């Protein structure tokens, strides 16, 4: 198995059983990569893998709850046993609170839940997978961020990001900040880490109110996952280029 797997790029996409995550997995599979479909829900994970395989992708399921230490450790063990390394990690899993949501009235339980998934979950998965990524010749990390996490955009007059967000937007700002710190720590290595802004995509995260399709939203993460060795690191991008922090 390891001999066969070593000939392919090995990717793991968290939250890949639906929405943007599924479309990222599908596109990477279409490139001929072996793609781990990370998801908590066993039925949805199994269905997503079956659908991807039916389309010709080399997909495999990874039981993964980004908020649980043992689940993440078990996922790392599975990938090591299956492939011996990891080439691309796409931290796509995320949750949203209410919208709009004022910081003066936000439920602190909501804030904690969002930070646990959108920030700590990314740190937990990234740190667990770093040992496997270091074995790759071309390791890439892509974190799914958002325009709403950009402090520059949030403070630019006339820019409409959908109203006040007391929980979700700040978690993406926090994610942006930690990505910068990872880039600083990993400078001098061959690991490239960047954040992707998918745009306003119609998913269950926003009650399918978005104006873009999941396929369109997946495009920038796919580009960042396949960056050349001299590609950028420590930046945030959307389909039009660099997004200010």
List where the protein language model places each region.
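Catalytic loop of short-chain dehydrogenase/reductase
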Residues: 95-115, 134-187
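Canonical Rossmann dinucleotide-binding motif of NAD(H)/NADP(H)-dependent dehydrogenases/reductases
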Residues: 4-36
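The beta1-alpha1 cofactor-binding region of Rossmann-like NAD(H)/NADP(H)-dependent oxidoreductases
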Residues: 42-43, 63-77, 108
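C-terminal helical subdomain
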Residues: 173-176, 188, 195-196, 203, ...
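Hydrophobic positions on the long internal alpha-helix
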Residues: 90, 125-129, 133, 178-179, ...
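A glycine-rich helix->loop->beta "capping" turn
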Residues: 57-58, 78-91, 97-99, 107
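Conserved glycine-rich Rossmann-like NAD(P)H-binding loop of the short-chain dehydrogenase/reductase
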Residues: 31-47
């Amino acid at each position: 198995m390891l001999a066969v797997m070593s000939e392919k790029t090995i990717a793991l996409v968290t939250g890949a059983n639906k929405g943007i995550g599924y479309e990222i997995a599908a596109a990477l599979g279409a490139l001929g990569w072996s793609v781990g479909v990370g998801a908590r829900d066993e039925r949805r994970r199994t269905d997503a893998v079956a659908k991807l395989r039916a389309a010709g992708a080399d997909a495999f399921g990874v039981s993964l709850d980004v908020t649980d230490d043992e689940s993440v450790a078990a996922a790392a063990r599975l990938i090591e046993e299956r492939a011996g390394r990891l080439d691309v990690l796409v931290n796509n899993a995320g949750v949203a609170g209410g919208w709009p949501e004022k910081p003066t009235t936000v439920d602190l339980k909501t804030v904690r839940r969002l930070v646990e998934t959108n920030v700590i979950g990314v740190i937990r998965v990234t740190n667990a997978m770093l040992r496997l990524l270091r074995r790759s010749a071309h390791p890439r990390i892509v974190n799914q961020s958002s325009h709403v996490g950009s402090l520059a955009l949030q403070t630019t007059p006339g820019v409409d990001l959908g109203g006040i967000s007391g929980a979700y937007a700040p978690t993406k700002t926090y994610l942006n900040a930690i990505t910068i710190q990872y880039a600083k720590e990993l400078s001098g290595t061959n690991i490239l880490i960047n954040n992707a802004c998918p745009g306003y995509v119609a998913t269950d995260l926003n009650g399918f109110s978005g104006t873009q399709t999941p396929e369109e939203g997946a495009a920038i993460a796919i580009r960042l996952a396949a960056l050349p060795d001299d590609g950028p690191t420590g930046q945030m991008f959307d389909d039009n280029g660099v997004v200010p922090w």
